[in-house]
Amino acid sequence: ANGKTIVELPIHWLLDDAPNFVYAPVANRLGPMRNPNEVYGTWAAEFEGLYRYGRAFTLTMHPQYIGRPGRLLMLERLIEHIKSFPNVEFTRAIDVAKMWA
């Protein structure tokens, strides 16, 4: 109606920090919280699969979950791993959406 396009960027629980690191008894999320090394392995494998097929790797992160020292070290290691692949771009979600609009 207004000439604007809606673009939905795919997300997946597997690439969200919340299911891995939330401990919230009031929400019936009692853990166990995963070890950052386990999460690294999952996220690295998912990146490699998405890279192989030329797809976007979209992490969903919340500062209150990913923002712990050990988790940030894991995230830094993951970023270095991703940067080791040729032709990888780190792009804002809005810029990816504009590519498809």
Where are these predicted regions, by residue range?
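Active-site-adjacent pocket scaffolds in enzyme catalytic domains
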Residues: 1-53
